[in-house]
Amino acid sequence: MTDVPTSAPRSTSKSEFSHETVLLFETVAAVLGEKSLNDNTPKHDGIYVDATFGRGGHSKLLLNYLSDDAKLFVFDKDPEAIDVANDLAAEDKRVIVVHDSFADMTQCLNSRGVSQVDGIMADLGVSSPQLDDGSRGFSFMRDGAIDMRMDTSRGQPVGEWLQTVDEETLADVLYDFGEERHSRRIARAIKGMTQYTSTLELAEVIKQAHPKWQKGKHPATQSFQAMRIFINNELGDIDSFLAQSLTLLAPQGQLAVISFHSLEDRRIKQFLQRHSRGQYPEDENLPMPPQRPRYFSKPKRIAPSKAEVTVNNRSRSAWLRVATRTDTPYNTDPSPQHS
């Protein structure tokens, strides 16, 4: 992507916690199908989706490039994010707020009379305000209840789950969702706790149980990530979200997804590869190689600029993957298509 501004302005919200929107200009340009954003960028008609509104940084910039007749559906599970989204919707009639997971995107849009959209963007994982607010339980640097739910109005907090989960299952969660090599040892230490009420106490137990950790990285990082991903079914939701993009995106519609760790990025990469290569592996028992329809084209990965990483250190691990929906109607029949 060329001629994209190298840093993002600080987004504003009524929250006391600041939030730097990652890959702001790159993401909005990608979801519009533009190489860059400038004064000559045309206003776009159509229907767009911000699948993870957060504090609205991407949505607010996108609205500057949408026509008066365009629509922007914004999704989020977090009630605090929805409060910010409702404030934006009160000011801009183009914004429609949906308090739900992007895993239910198709159902939510269909119920509002929308069957296809022109662009979908998502910024995966936990946001800076969520991390910075100790009461949410995401942070191992600030004390609070061990909650970690994206949607605090439903579901089970991590602290309650830890009271009943067995040691083996906990170890599997730490390994599978946090890629924690010392998962067995850490799980044993966690299950030795008498209560699960403080994130700082939990982080300290993990630290004491961790025999070796990477310099500059808190030893509880991967364990907290694992428990958060598990309790919110984040990977399952991502898989559902990506699958729905096949049917929701109109021909030449744009998909733009930001991820922050390998478990997320690997899923997005494999999904786009699978649906953009257009051919099954060769089978010697078939008379000719079978063809799979190509549902996406031009997949690419974009990293934050050095300037952005300097301004916002949390962007250092971010990757933006973008792709264009082809004109091929989605075929739900998995059988090969012969050319």
UniProtKB/Swiss-Prot annotation:
Gene Ontology CC annotation, any one: cytoplasm
Keyword ATP-binding appears in the UniProt entry: no
InterPro entries assigned to the protein according to its UniProt record, in alphabetical order: RsmH, SAM-dep_MeTrfase_MraW_recog, SAM-dependent_MTases_sf
Main location: cytoplasm
Source superkingdom: Bacteria
EC number: 2.1.1.199
GO biological process: one example: rRNA base methylation
Region (Disordered): 274-309, 320-339
Residues holding S-adenosyl-L-methionine: G56, G57, H58, D76, F102, D123, Q130
UniProt biased composition (Polar residues): 325-339
Keywords of the record: Cytoplasm, Methyltransferase, rRNA processing, S-adenosyl-L-methionine, Transferase
SUPFAM superfamilies linked to this entry: Putative methyltransferase TM0872, insert domain, S-adenosyl-L-methionine-dependent methyltransferases
UniProt xrefs under Gene3D superfamilies: Putative methyltransferase TM0872, insert domain, Vaccinia Virus protein VP39
GO molecular function: rRNA (cytosine-N4-)-methyltransferase activity
Catalytic activity entry: cytidine(1402) in 16S rRNA + S-adenosyl-L-methionine = N(4)-methylcytidine(1402) in 16S rRNA + S-adenosyl-L-homocysteine + H(+)
Residues that span the membrane, as ranges: none
Subcellular compartments: Cytoplasm
NCBIfam families in UniProt: 16S rRNA (cytosine(1402)-N(4))-methyltransferase RsmH
PANTHER family: 12S RRNA N4-METHYLCYTIDINE METHYLTRANSFERASE (PTHR11265:SF0), S-ADENOSYL-METHYLTRANSFERASE MRAW (PTHR11265)
Function description: Specifically methylates the N4 position of cytidine in position 1402 (C1402) of 16S rRNA.
Family listed: Belongs to the methyltransferase superfamily. RsmH family.
Entry protein name: Ribosomal RNA small subunit methyltransferase H
Organism: Psychrobacter sp. (strain PRwf-1)
